[in-house]
Design a protein with these regions (language model features):
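A short, N-terminal "cap"/entry segment at the start of jelly-roll beta-barrel domains
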Residues: 1-47, 92-93
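Conserved short histidine dyad/triad with adjacent acidic residue
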Residues: 44-61
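A cytosolic small-molecule/anion-sensing beta-strand core signal
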Residues: 47, 70-71, 115
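Short beta-strand segments in beta-sandwich/barrel cores
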Residues: 55-57, 72-78, 100, 127
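Glycine- and acidic-residue-biased ligand/ion/polar-headgroup-sensing regions
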Residues: 62-83
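Short acidic-glycine-tyrosine-enriched beta hairpin
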Residues: 81-105
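Ligand-binding loop in jelly-roll beta-barrel domains
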Residues: 97, 102-130
Length: 133
């Protein structure tokens, strides 16, 4: 007879969070599982894992994006460009388990992973990354 716990899934036990791979030229502590794009007007979806202490430098993306925090805690700082370089734009934003964050296309931001994070990341159309240092 199956136990009730045999029917339960969490982000620790679900196959959804397996088969992640490292990607060259990305921060240490980052792994991802991606989908296969089949629609040029579709969305790029990634299941991301970030180790606590990992940071992404200021960057932007060509499309709007949405991040859903499945597990963990992270922060985002927005920036604007000035003649002196990048200047923080507003206060740092924190996203916790269960939170959803949206970032407009082209908006410069960083990301810091305060705790181990599992994220569902959705990018409008094909994903792109532009370093803004």
């Amino acid at each position: 007879m199956p136990k009730d716990t045999d029917k339960e899934l969490t982000s620790d036990t679900s196959a959804i969070w397996k088969n992640h791979v490292s990607v060259p030229d990305t921060p240490k502590g980052f792994t991802v599982r991606t989908t296969y794009p089949s629609n040029p007007d579709g969305a790029d979806v990634m299941l991301e894992r970030w180790e606590a202490g990992t940071e992404e430098p200021p960057h932007s993306h060509p499309g709007d994006d949405m991040t859903i925090v499945v597990e963990g805690r992270m922060s985002i700082q927005f920036y604007t460009k000035s003649t002196d370089g990048l200047v923080p734009d507003g206060q740092q934003i924190y996203l916790n388990k269960g939170d959803t964050g949206y970032i407009k296309a082209g908006r410069i931001h960083d990301a810091k992973y305060i705790e181990d994070c599992k994220l569902v990341y959705v990018h409008d159309k094909a994903f792109g990354f532009t370093a803004e240092i």
